[in-house]
């Protein structure tokens, strides 16, 4: 009986080791890269070619006494209206994050005058792609 338990344990362990584990990694995006969250930056161009997925997050670096990060609706985004935000992501440090928890479009802007100078970002968050199919290793010879 002891030998069969060892054999069963070995088979279960081998299965667990060989089973594919989906890679779940959130990505942190530094908004604007080394230019950060500042006026006169084309954030539409910055976002081009990037795929934002549920679980990712946007990291904003800015002068805390000059700028902020507000989420607004599409109409307010297009007109740079900031007096009725959906959410204020500013925490006061000038190093703030926007977690992307939902598959939807996020309209973000600076509500302290920077929006009219280009400080606005439209991000479409997608469902993460499925993990690649598991290919079992070739049998040992």
Swiss-Prot record:
The keyword Transit peptide does not apply. One of its GO terms (molecular function) is electron transfer activity. Disulfide bonds join 80-115. Pfam families: Cu_bind_like (PF02298). SUPFAM superfamilies: Cupredoxins (SSF49503). The keyword Acetylation does not apply. InterPro entries: Cupredoxin (IPR008972), Phytocyanin-like (IPR039391), Phytocyanin_dom (IPR003245). Belongs to the early nodulin-like (ENODL) family. May act as a carbohydrate transporter. This is Early nodulin-like protein 19. The lineage of its organism: Eukaryota, Viridiplantae, Streptophyta, Embryophyta, Tracheophyta. The gene is ENODL19.
